[in-house]
């Protein structure tokens, strides 16, 4: 397992590492499990640079669905890798039709990347070669006869995603409550049920109890958090820079149990203050 990063570049980097360590050229079914907004599409782009997703959070990219057009493919130049978002495609096709298309692609020696794999598994009858769950943590498994089953990953990643969303929103609220100079000086890190703000060179002049009080006041105001573009969110209507704009709670009031460590910790290895 890995802590699921929240910034886009961090997820891309982790995707590349996962591909190098766990992906095999013999894998035909690669299943992803996780709620919308958990970062599955970004992780897939990191694992498979240059892949054209049939759809993502921005809309539909490829139509008709290439997986369902296999019978019309002729000659040498046919796709080797297909992408399939089960939750999205069930709005247009029956699950049984999609399962038949996946089985045909496997027989033809193709590779299929399937989002929301847990929805098609009961009809497919076979598990994925590589099964990845995305929640607060990224869980990577290579199932065998004894499991794990997709539902086991669902039980882990679906409940845990809420902590990741809360941590990311709280992280951005801290930045929002800082001065511009302090915000530009810090970088982000990931820990379980929380976040890390790191400062290089010298300890910042930040009154931590005051910063915590400011953030708790923003939480009490229950400000809406909305997607603006791929690099910004709207925090109570104010534009704020963010590299993971879809990985947030809907409003600040949904952040529960926020608090900050009341002192800085010096990391002697990286020479940073946290």
Regions found by a protein language model. Name each.
Residues 30, 47-50, 68-69, 92-95, ...:
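Conserved mixed alpha/beta catalytic, RNA-binding, or beta-rich assembly cores of soluble enzyme
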Residues 55-118:
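Conserved nucleotide-sensing/catalytic segment adjacent to the nucleotide-binding pocket
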